[in-house]
Amino acid sequence: MRTLLIGLCGPKGVGKSTYARSLGGVTLSFATPIKEMLKVVLPHPAWLDRKEEPIPGFPEGITTRNMLQTLGTEWGRESIYPNIWVDAAKRMAEPYLGKRLVVFDDIRFPNEAWAIKRWADLYKIGYKIIHISREGHEIDPSDSHISEHGIPEHFITEWVTVDDKQQAE
């Protein structure tokens, strides 16, 4: 049975995870290992959903998003090696590839988009890299973290705009 592999990209807060769930299939994230690591550090696992709020007991201004970004990028991608999360994601996806729809809800870097294409070729399945947008949730040029700069347009195979009603569902 052949199926599809989808990667979603777009600005933070646009609704990528919500859109992924609406597609059905298996939703996975490149950030899953990072989130699992943070569960040990955060005061409570619920802080993973409160990404923009300062975390009590940490230096002023430290948020879950800041911790996800620095652990994932500065430590994982830059200090260890660029494909650390791609390799982990492949291990998570392998049981499903070619058997079910698989959706990655957090493409943030070109190597992640490239991995989606490579895995689709390897498993002889179709793939899409879908850019999700929503009015009022554009990429913020003042956000200096590289993970928020978006991926080059040549990776994107489809553009989808969601509205606030779709986001809330």
Question: What are the language-model segments listed below?
Answer:
Residues 1-6, 128:
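Extreme N-terminal starter segment of soluble prokaryotic enzymes
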Residues 32-99:
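ATP-dependent small-molecule kinase phosphotransfer cores
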Residues 16:
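Conserved lysine of the Walker
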Residues 26, 88-145:
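ATP-dependent NMP and nucleoside kinases share a basic, alpha-helical "lid"
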Residues 6-8, 104:
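Hydrophobic anchor at the beta1->P-loop junction of P-loop NTPases
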Residues 103-107, 154-167:
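Phosphate-binding beta-loop-alpha motif at adenosine-nucleotide cofactor sites
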Residues 11:
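P-loop (Walker A) phosphate-binding loop of NTP-binding proteins
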Residues 19:
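Hydrophobic positions on the alpha1 helix immediately C-terminal to the Walker A/P-loop
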